């Protein structure tokens, strides 16, 4: 019986993190234990579709776009309570969310940093002060068309998204240093 040997290649950014960035962070922060070095835990991509309260078909486009961008089926988020002013009932779909971990996370981050962010018009860099106090970073994109996987002709409407990068860093400075070494284009304040 022959077995097919499948060679799995490590994502480019993950390899760079293990070979270069861990050493740079250990040197910069004088960590004694290699497990103290901050790393990535997960990336959460959230797309809110408030208009879906009036037209339920809009959520399908958001789910399709998010699945195309991330390569993973999104979870449809539903309203937890009714709000009369927004014509919203409990249980209505109002958004889609994907949590990326492992190799998919590293590949998505690589595509985001090397392809998607440079395609944003008038991009001046990300705000480096938006960390949450625990080393996690959240930022928003105004349109899904910056990702090359999305076919420009099949976009039914522009949708923005929130991207949260969760790290094991304990302070904002450690988180910012990790993200800067990974290649996040922060503005110089």
Curated annotation (Swiss-Prot):
NCBIfam families: PRK00010.1. Keywords: Ribonucleoprotein, Ribosomal protein, RNA-binding, rRNA-binding, tRNA-binding. Gene3D superfamilies: 3.30.1440.10. InterPro entries: Ribosomal_uL5, Ribosomal_uL5_bac-type, Ribosomal_uL5_C, Ribosomal_uL5_dom_sf, Ribosomal_uL5_N. It comes from Salinispora arenicola (strain CNS-205). Transmembrane segments: none annotated. One of its GO terms (biological process) is translation. Pfam families: Ribosomal_L5, Ribosomal_L5_C. SUPFAM superfamilies: RL5-like. Part of the 50S ribosomal subunit; part of the 5S rRNA/L5/L18/L25 subcomplex. Contacts the 5S rRNA and the P site tRNA. Forms a bridge to the 30S subunit in the 70S ribosome. The gene is rplE. Belongs to the universal ribosomal protein uL5 family. This is Large ribosomal subunit protein uL5. The keyword Ribosomal protein applies. This is one of the proteins that bind and probably mediate the attachment of the 5S RNA into the large ribosomal subunit, where it forms part of the central protuberance. In the 70S ribosome it contacts protein S13 of the 30S subunit (bridge B1b), connecting the 2 subunits; this bridge is implicated in subunit movement. Contacts the P site tRNA; the 5S rRNA and some of its associated proteins might help stabilize positioning of ribosome-bound tRNAs. GO terms for molecular function: rRNA binding; structural constituent of ribosome; tRNA binding.
């Amino acid at each position: 019986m022959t077995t097919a040997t499948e060679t799995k290649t490590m994502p480019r950014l993950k390899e760079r993190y293990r070979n270069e960035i861990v050493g740079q962070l250990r040197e910069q922060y004088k960590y004694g234990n290699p497990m103290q070095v901050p790393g990535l835990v997960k990336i959460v991509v959230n797309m809110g579709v408030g208009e879906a309260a009036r037209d339920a078909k809009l959520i399908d486009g958001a789910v399709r776009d998010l699945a195309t961008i991330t390569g993973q089926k999104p979870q449809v988020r539903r309203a937890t309570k009714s709000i009369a002013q927004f014509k919203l009932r409990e249980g209505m779909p109002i958004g889609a969310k994907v949590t990326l971990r492992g190799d998919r996370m590293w590949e998505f981050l690589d595509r985001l940093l090397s392809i998607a962010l440079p395609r944003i018009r008038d991009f001046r860099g990300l705000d480096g002060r938006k960390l949450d106090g625990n080393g996690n970073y959240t930022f928003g994109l105004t349109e899904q068309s910056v990702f090359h996987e999305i076919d420009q002709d099949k976009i039914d409407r522009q949708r923005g998204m929130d991207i949260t990068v969760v790290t094991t860093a304990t302070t904002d400075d450690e988180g910012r240093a990790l993200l800067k070494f990974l290649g996040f284009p922060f503005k110089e304040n």
